[in-house]
């Protein structure tokens, strides 16, 4: 008969190592980050995310120019609504693009399973994911300018060419693991492999679907991502409409004002990754760091949005608060969004896709619920929308704070069959 036994009998004795605190007896001396292979891969992923989101954003920007250049003049029948956004602030321009972007994120997490040392995982993931925000900023800032000066086809030529360069770079630079990487130093290879040997095994095992469905830490990540995406969706879709209706200023007509929140978010997101890893070097438990990052990325952002209806100042102050709120929200990149790499590194790519799919329900619900509240109460509708945002965000955050973990789960550990 066959029974399942733990591959590592000392796993329970290394709880601090499971909390991702650096154990100097297991991990060799850290190698420099500058010109290292792992940070080179993070920059390539940053460029890939930049390209993916920028290509989605320019589709919405150039669509207006395409229609205006091919259709006769007619009576205006436009709307101030825009399409939903994704978890990191990227505009979702077409439903068919959502599965593609989910696979891109899941694939990236599969790379970090083999390339991301636990004590550097926050900054590596933040560098990679921040490419989405830089892509939004660049496309919004120059997409309209290129369309007006060179013509809308050149927008596709330029960003399509960037995509081709990105593909070539991916094929040359990206490898499955450090062992097969031809340009990595021996010291860095040993450092990465030793850092991950307690988490990632070599054998392939089936997905423990039932255990995942019963896992409260997994559900805390899913609900936390859902509530945070509710925040981001409302922030990007409805805040510009709010400023337009209250202050009679259309910030979407100003490329710099529209792009400013994304460049601020880009900076704060990467700084947050470095701060998270810095706290780990100060012997903070990993779950503490993840929860601090999630709190800072959720509560201040939602509180700033709730305060908007009570401001007596002009639209500049409101836009500044919106920019700050958008920037702070990306701190969750170092918190809840990479938590699956901590609790189940072997299945992180699948769980990233699953949690992202679950959280994508929020952008579908937000326009319907918010539109209903605004139509029912024109006077206090905006306050109701923002208080609902705060309530949903707070509930998801509390659930994550109560049930979130950072230890590798029992069902995610490597096991082997022994014959008796």
Curated annotation (Swiss-Prot):
Keyword Ligase set for record: no
Residues bearing glycans: 49, 60, 68, 77
Which GO terms of the molecular function aspect are on file? efflux transmembrane transporter activity; organic anion transmembrane transporter activity; sodium:phosphate symporter activity; toxin transmembrane transporter activity; urate transmembrane transporter activity; voltage-gated monoatomic anion channel activity; xenobiotic transmembrane transporter activity
Q: Name one GO biological process term.
A: urate transport
Expression (tissue specificity): Expressed in the liver and kidney. It is detected in proximal tubules in renal cortex as well as some tubules and glomeruli, with highest expression at the apical side of proximal tubules (at protein level).
Q: Which family does it belong to?
A: Belongs to the major facilitator superfamily. Sodium/anion cotransporter family.
Name used for this protein in its record: Sodium-dependent phosphate transport protein 4
List the InterPro entries hit by this protein, alphabetically.
MFS, MFS_dom, MFS_Na/Anion_cotransporter, MFS_trans_sf, Na-dep_P-transpt_4_prd
Q: Which UniProt keywords apply?
A: Cell membrane, Endoplasmic reticulum, Glycoprotein, Ion transport, Membrane, Sodium, Sodium transport, Symport, Transmembrane, Transmembrane helix, Transport
Impact noted for substituting residue 68 to H: Found in a patient with gout; does not affect isoform 2 localization at the cell membrane; results in reduced urate efflux
Residues passing through the membrane, by range: 126-146, 154-174, 218-238, 256-276, 292-314, 319-341, 357-377, 385-405
Q: Where is this region: Disordered?
A: 1-21
State a GO cellular component annotated for this protein: perinuclear region of cytoplasm
Q: What is the lineage of its organism?
A: Eukaryota, Metazoa, Chordata, Craniata, Vertebrata
